[in-house]
Amino acid sequence: MVMRMYDIVIIGAGPAGLFAAYELITNNPKLKVAILDKGKLAEERICPMSKDKNCYNCNPCNILSGYGGAGTFSDGKLNFTPKIGKSDLMKYMDENEANNLIDETEEVFNHFGMDSKSYPTNMKQALEIKRKVAITGAKLMIIKQKHLGSDKLPIYIHNITEELIKNKVEVRENCDVLDIISKDKNSHQIITKDEKILTKYVIVAPGRTGAKWVQELADKYQIPYTSKSIEIGVRVEVRKEILEDITNVIYDPTIFIKTDTYGDEIRTFCTNPGGFVAKEKYNEYICVNGHALKDIKSNNSNFVFISKVTLTQPVTNTRAYG
């Protein structure tokens, strides 16, 4: 059996994988690139829970796996900032370079029609809200934001995927990668359930569902790694009008609060004006999430109070906890 040969194979078709393929093929159209994902194309990812509220333990899960990644059914918030929550681009580059990358990313989003009204809608009002928050001892972070909508994201992911196909990127779905055998720096063999694939380079970006597998690969090849902190929170739902004075100006306000008892820092996260609270099952765990559609609104809004937890010895591996 003749093995397929590529210049670059990308494992995982979430935002990292899709953007990597787009950048590679845009800068060098002659490259032979393939994307492998164990899930389905975005337009084929249908969760049975959306119809009868029952989880059938699909393998792989259509919510977590497939083109677009685990965020395909989120509400599509874009936060144009180099640092928020656990994410901090300035660990890897200076602030100017990070902001330039953010501008380039926004241009790609706009190229695919992923554009909407920018927040804050009124900077003067936003600064006044920030002042009022500061009086309470909390801190409001003002950043540029856009909201795309849960109902629109699969369409956008489909459009990105179609452009990659048009530019000769090989798009593979239902392709579960089991192992990578690295012979040397420029020769790798990818083992899937059905075949072996040869490639000069590999980009490993399997996302949330692939975290355990990546850790196993790192152990196999003695690649050092550290575990990031996890964030644990509760989702709160209120009548929409209670938050409108803020959310009409700042769509997803990030407010940092120091707790009185232990001095822990918590923050608001993932605000969904006129949104919906949804039950989600992650393997044996049942959680709640929130999202907001572009065209259909509820009478409620929801948000999360979230706290960062960093584990210490002897239990430092946060992967098993989220």
Language-model features and meaning:
Residues 2-82, 124-322:
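Residues forming the flavin
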